[in-house]
Amino acid sequence: SYYPFWDGTNENMQNVARNIDEKSGKKVYIAETSYCYTSEDGDGFDNSLKGTDDLVDGYAATVQSQATMIRDICAAANEADVLGVFYWEGTWIPVGEKTADNSALWEKYGSGWASSYSADYDPDDAGLYYGGCSWDNQAMFDFTGHPLASLNVFKYLKYGATAPLAVDFIPEVSV
């Protein structure tokens, strides 16, 4: 796994991947990565990446920053001779609205990490943190299931794309 908001810079990821390759002779796959497209919470269950004080420098909580982050991770992985990158978890959207009591929906249909039944086999992790989706603001679909424009980044990585330069966000400056 490589989550830039938890695991450091792309350069750090490259160094780790190269070190694994050099020491073990094994190539690396990045089996999980993601980034938020919003700081909103879609189901009332706290998000793992809030999209506020925990953002990566140079990236906002926007659809464009989500796409740019994915592109930058893939480019850095390619430079480090990483075999590939999987996005986690692009379809993890809420099962009910933020304002609803989602507990019954989470138990019946599942959502997020686990249901309460997981306490039987994983009491210290999933058994404590079951319920809604902590990843809904990092999906590649909005809270109602419509695809985000950032989903196109995978097509652009394969086939290329050109676009006019545009400002995604302007960071606040304090003096």
Where are these regions (language model features)?
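Glycoside hydrolase catalytic-domain groove-lining segments
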Residues: 1-54, 71-82
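Alpha-helix N-cap and loop-to-helix initiation/capping positions
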Residues: 8, 12, 58-65
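Aromatic-rich peripheral "rim/lid" segments of glycoside hydrolase catalytic domains that contact
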Residues: 40-48, 60-68, 88-166
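A generic short-segment signal for beta-strand/edge and adjacent turn/coil regions
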Residues: 53-56, 122
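Hydrophobic, well-ordered secondary-structure elements that form the walls
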Residues: 85
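Short, solvent-exposed loop/edge segments of extracellular or virion-exposed proteins
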Residues: 166-175
